[in-house]
From Swiss-Prot:
Pathway: Cofactor biosynthesis; pyrroloquinoline quinone biosynthesis. Ring cyclization and eight-electron oxidation of 3a-(2-amino-2-carboxyethyl)-4,5-dioxo-4,5,6,7,8,9-hexahydroquinoline-7,9-dicarboxylic-acid to PQQ. HAMAP family: PQQ_syn_PqqC. Signal peptide: none annotated. It holds the Pfam family TENA_THI-4. GO terms for biological process: pyrroloquinoline quinone biosynthetic process; sulfur compound metabolic process. GO terms for molecular function: pyrroloquinoline-quinone synthase activity. Its EC number is 1.3.3.11. It comes from the Bacteria. It catalyses: 6-(2-amino-2-carboxyethyl)-7,8-dioxo-1,2,3,4,7,8-hexahydroquinoline-2,4-dicarboxylate + 3 O2 = pyrroloquinoline quinone + 2 H2O2 + 2 H2O + H(+). SUPFAM superfamilies: Heme oxygenase-like (SSF48613). This is Pyrroloquinoline-quinone synthase. Belongs to the PqqC family.
Length: 255
């Protein structure tokens, strides 16, 4: 399968305004967001086996269940009460609230529907080493870099609605083991992600006031795209090329 990855960023130029920074951010998304990865093209095009889809959902669960941990770290970086209040809803979006399911619950509906044992999924013992390292690197990034960069790293949400829509239509049309119930996570993110992205974009536009700060925002987004891309590289290497590392989940057709 051929894939055009020729999209490149504009030549380096000083980011003298918020508009210039936003333009650069959108270029980064167009060139580097993981909707361009071959594994996602296979997933959405119906080219994967059920076992390969199981491996994707199992590994992605580690990312999903770590997102509220990441968001709690982001909240801890701010003395500003208004920012903490704004960011707090992200915890409930993923963890849920009393009497209301969250994104992690919806992801487990997906893995249940794919026939994976819930206790095994939640243990994360079968995930790929690269999945664990990439996700943990994301948590470390928001902990160790500036609060501005922590928020900027979430800007992949600018590009998420398109991939969610493609995933919903593609997987429903191509896989007989997928139904609307198990795709509930992605359906909900169609409205949650734009809200989150709008806030994060406004924040970096308002608070990145120098060319250096705007460059740091752009580099934070690049880092996040690398976190996402690395996870798909690992899935492709293990479950398409067949190099499953010791201790990782092995689909039935590969046993």
């Amino acid at each position: 399968m051929s894939l055009d990855l020729s999209t490149s960023l504009s030549p380096a130029r000083p980011l003298e305004s918020a508009d210039a920074m936003e333009e650069r951010l959108r270029e980064i998304g167009a060139a580097r967001y993981h909707d361009r990865h071959p594994f996602h093209h296979m997933l959405h095009g119906g080219e994967l086996t059920k076992g390969q889809v199981q491996a994707w959902a199992l590994n992605r669960y580690y990312y999903q269940c770590t997102i509220p941990v990441k968001d709690a770290v982001v909240i801890s970086r701010f003395r500003d009460r208004a920012t903490r209040i704004e960011w707090r809803h992200r915890l409930e979006d993923h963890d849920g609230a009393e009497g209301a399911e969250g994104g992690i619950d919806r992801w487990l509906i997906l893995t249940d529907g794919l026939g994976l044992d819930r206790a095994y999924v939640e243990s994360t013992e079968g995930i790929l080493p690269a999945t664990r390292f990439a996700v943990e690197a994301y948590v470390h990034f928001v902990r160790d870099r500036s609060p501005l960069e922590a928020i900027a790293s979430c800007l992949t949400e600018l590009f998420a609605p398109n991939i969610h829509a493609t995933r919903i239509s593609g997987m429903l049309s191509h896989y007989d083991f997928i139904n609307p119930t198990v795709m509930a996570y992605f359906q909900r993110r169609l409205t949650q992600a734009p809200r989150d992205a709008d806030y994060a974009l406004r924040y970096v536009r308002d608070h990145a006031r120098t060319p250096e700060e705007r460059a740091a925002v752009c580099n934070a987004l690049i880092f996040k795209t690398q976190v996402l891309w690395t996870q798909l590289d690992a899935l492709h290497h293990a479950y398409v090329l067949g190099h499953v590392p010791p201790g990782a989940f092995v689909p039935e057709e590969m046993r």
